[in-house]
Amino acid sequence: METNDKEEEQAPEEIDKAPPFGSIEWIYYWSEFEGSLPTPIDVSITGSLKYWCPDLEWYNFDVYPHKVKITNTGYTVLLGAKWRAERPYLLGGPFSEKHVFSQVHFHWGSNMMEGSEHTVDKRIYPAEMQVTFFKSEYMTQQDALRHPDGVVIICYLIKYGVNSDERLQWVVEGFTRIQEAQTSTRIGPYPLSRLFPMFFEDYFLYWGSLNTVKGENFTVRWLVPRATLYASFEQMKEFRKLWNPWDEPNLRNFRPLQERHDRHIFFISPHWSQYNSLLPIPRVPEPSIAILSPAYKTRPWLLPPQNADLLPQENENGEDKII
């Protein structure tokens, strides 16, 4: 009886430990309880929790990298890049600290009726592009995976489009040089802002596990933006021409859909029409919302020649300005 009394006395204290609703800390609070739940899942506005965060800020995504390399791992296409100075990173939104860019990889299926890992409103899409970031203090993605706040993956759904998406085309054009597994080639280089749409609001966030081929499970934050990419039938055919480790066409590399298990799905800073969970593809590409980081602003000579338009220019009053 004494033990039960003590447990009852401690219960209110446990509840009081939860951060206040509306804070970024309240989102992090649920990682302990939901970070081990399986992924991917279906997301939708229905059943999600509307939650407001500061604007998500995209730093250095207009800066040209020194090189961009794509690799056919035999399981996916992996895109990595290197910069001579500071790499792109995220700040703001649900992040209290800087999260730097790590890599991009893709998931696809054997036809246009499958391929995406996540579904939206129970609908499957032909492909999905996942962009991985990690908390800068952990130095590497592998180290960051061992911390519940270490890694975030942004999952862009790829819809079917009659025309080719130019944002994907400069990547797809390199596939003929990496048809065999474990082969790589350089492409571009172009800034990451040319590959995927940036957003500062209107996205879903949830906690879930990332399983590796070694059987390890890591807690990851998954972001699914309402903004999407699109791919033509011909572009998707190029994905299916890539070989797996057994010298066969890699036709399917997506994981099966998992149950939601009553976890929190945060609908961060909703803004546009909520008639559909995904936004329509804009007829005209959205202008870049990338920000130049203080490191480049104070040392503009670190910018590559292709970014001359970002260099400080002297105005009529003799003052420097960024154009």
Model region roles, listed by residue range:
Residues 1-323:
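Alpha-carbonic anhydrase
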